[in-house]
Curated annotation (Swiss-Prot):
Protein name in the entry: Probable cytochrome P450 CYP44
UniProt xrefs under InterPro entries: CYP11_CYP27_families (IPR050479), Cyt_P450 (IPR001128), Cyt_P450_CS (IPR017972), Cyt_P450_E_grp-I (IPR002401), Cyt_P450_sf (IPR036396)
Molecular function terms, GO-annotated: heme binding; iron ion binding; monooxygenase activity; oxidoreductase activity, acting on paired donors, with incorporation or reduction of molecular oxygen
Family of this protein: Belongs to the cytochrome P450 family.
Entry keywords, A to Z: Heme, Iron, Metal-binding, Monooxygenase, Oxidoreductase
EC assignment: 1.14.-.-
Pfam annotation, one family: p450
Low complexity biased stretches: 16-29
Function: Cytochromes P450 are a group of heme-thiolate monooxygenases. They oxidize a variety of structurally unrelated compounds, including steroids, fatty acids, and xenobiotics.
Length: 489
């Protein structure tokens, strides 16, 4: 990890961004960090607006609230969350990002993305999951999956299954186009993500792109409602911490329904698998896990549940965002089709990869990468003590006018192919960084590349309806019309 930070840091001076303070300037105190005006107990006025007006319209614009704070206060902003919650420091400077991540250590600490899910699982006597754990227990579970999930050569083992799902997706899109004249990718992308999870995690087809699409839609809708309610409870008054509120009871009901379905899938898969004394390097994921001697069945289910719910929530929106960018930029789609036609068997697909990378930049799936500092730091010339929650606001960084000076709000995949245009290495972090980088990153990239190549190679794609933007529902999800037209080439 430290070597990767050094490698990235070598390019920092080439990038058009100046440091925010001189090393000779004495640091200012934590209390001097700018931010919205505080009210005792309540906290910051800006944040309190979300606590009082915790309706859907207000919550959906939380990402805009973060952008407005950056424009008003600058590269570092402090918010008092109020009602017994601690401060959070928002940073928008890649130099500060580098400082925070370089101090990660072996086990970086984070603020759980979904406190409600953490509370639910602990209440049920379950492990909170990879995304909600910190310390030695997180490190133990994460280390167990590192080989199978983060090494490119290991992920290649799953390519045949990704290809099966991409072929099913092409057939499903053709069926939807024929039946309805247009394709609702909000539904189809979710089914695709669920089917991919079945092949990778449960080692079987779930029928999500076939005769079980209605069952798949129900599970996807449950997951969506959990994320929507989680966002409302995260930004609202945290009364559920003390009392069983109507929102909390609704959350428990949703989680119960979701977990019962996924638990059945996990048990069905694990009951059919056997411990094998042979080399585990070529095993599929669940088989690999049960053959890890340091993992018991409970550990395996925790990992599978984390991977399943995280993948369902992130990969499907990214397929929609990629299709939208290609459908609204036909010249890019034609370039991909040319690339595929010239070498159908190639897996390089350089331009398609650049388009996917640009889509991650334009449509980041999250508002931030979080950390809890484990040592005292100096950020933008201010003292930030150990134990402070710090949000690296990737949503702002990846569309920054200085960091991406060449039309940051426009879709320009060529920017990733032009070596002359250096990008600050800590400005682009769609999967996080270091030991807590998204565990499913390489699976997601492989699934997107394989399925987009199949769709682009078979169809001319057009978007129909209002433009797609983003709303905040714990993650940044599509807002607008996700209807597409697929014409056979």
């Amino acid at each position: 990890m430290r070597r990767s930070i050094r490698n990235l840091a070598e390019n920092v001076e080439k990038c058009p961004y100046s440091p925010t303070s001189s090393p000779n300037t004495p640091p200012r105190t934590f209390s001097e960090i700018p931010g919205p005006r505080e009210i005792p107990v309540i906290g910051n006025i800006g944040y309190f607006k979300y606590a009082v007006k915790s309706d859907a319209k207000t919550i959906e614009n939380y990402n805009q609230h973060l952008e407005e704070m950056y424009k008003k206060y600058g590269k570092i902003v402090k918010e008092n969350l109020g009602f017994g919650r601690k401060y959070v420091v928002h940073i928008f400077d890649p130099a500060d990002v580098q400082t925070v991540l370089a101090a990660d250590g072996k086990t970086p600490f984070i603020v759980p993305l979904q406190e409600t899910t953490q509370k639910y699982r602990e209440m049920k006597g379950m492990n909170p999951g990879l995304g909600n754990l910190n310390g030695p227990e997180w490190y133990r579970l994460r280390s167990s999956v590192q080989h199978a999930m983060m090494r490119p050569q290991s992920v290649q083992t799953y390519l045949p299954f990704s290809q099966i799902v991409s072929n099913d997706l092409v057939c499903h899109v053709a069926d939807q186009q024929k039946r309805f004249g247009l394709v609702d990718m909000q539904k189809v992308a979710g089914r695709w993500s669920l089917e991919s999870a079945g092949q990778i995690l449960f080692e079987k087809s779930l029928g999500s792109l076939g005769n079980r699409s209605e069952w798949a839609d129900g599970l996807i809708e449950l997951n969506k409602k959990i994320f929507q309610l989680s966002a409302k409870m995260r930004l609202g008054l945290p009364i559920f911490r003390l009392f069983s509120t109507p929102s909390w009871r609704k959350m428990v009901d949703l989680e119960d329904q979701f977990y019962s379905e996924v638990d059945r899938l996990m048990d069905d898969a694990l009951d059919k698998l056997k411990v094998n004394d042979s080399d585990s390097k070529d095993m599929r994921f669940a088989s690999y896990l049960i053959n890890r001697k340091e993992l018991n069945r409970r550990d395996v289910k925790v990992i599978l549940l984390s991977m399943f719910s995280d993948g369902l929530s992130t990969t499907a929106p990214m397929l929609i965002y990629n299709l939208y960018n290609l459908a609204t930029h036909p010249e890019a789609l034609k370039e991909i089709q040319k690339e595929i036609k010239e070498d159908p068997a190639s897996s390089k697909l350089t331009f398609l990869r650049a388009c996917i990378k640009e889509t991650f930049r334009m449509f980041p799936i999250g508002t931030e990468v979080s950390r809890v500092t484990q040592k005292n730091l100096i950020l933008s010339g201010y003292e930030v003590p150990a134990g402070t929650a710090v949000d690296i606001n990737t949503n702002v960084l990846m569309r920054h006018e200085v960091l991406f000076s060449d039309s940051p709000r426009e879709f320009k995949p060529q920017r990733w192919l032009e070596k002359s245009k250096e990008v600050h290495p800590f400005a682009y972090l769609p999967f996080g960084f270091g030991p807590r980088m998204c565990a499913g990153r390489r699976f997601a990239e492989q699934d997107l590349l394989t399925s987009l190549a199949k769709l682009c190679g078979n169809y001319d794609i057009r978007h129909r309806g209002d433009p797609i933007t983003q709303i905040y529902e714990t993650l940044l999800l599509p807002r607008g019309d996700c209807t597409f037209e697929f014409k056979k080439l």
